Amino acid sequence: MLKPELSNQFKRDYNILTRRGYDITRLDAVIIILLKQLPLEPRHRDHPLKGKWHGYRGCHIADDWVLVYKIDGDRLKLMLSRTGTHVDVYGQ
């Protein structure tokens, strides 16, 4: 099982989503799946990212709610970088 490593930005994003009334249990469920190194369901649309986020992966918690993460297999860490809407995370 991987150990989570949360960026400061991820912590801020998490708090913002909580204040906005998002169902955080949906995010927590995806994080648990990733920590156990199990495959995500196709509805999460897990995919590698490009550009500024090259080397990271993105998945959908809901239609306009994404999680940006990276797995460091050498250190057995799940690095949680960002979460929020597409605009929050990617500025688009």
What are these regions (language model features)?
Residues 3, 16-25, 29, 59-66, ...:
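Enriched for short, Lys/Arg-rich terminal
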Residues 33-60:
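A short, surface-exposed loop/turn module that caps and links secondary-structure elements
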Residues 2-3, 7-8, 43:
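Basic nucleic-acid-binding interfaces
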Residues 11, 50, 90:
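Nucleotide phosphate-binding site architecture
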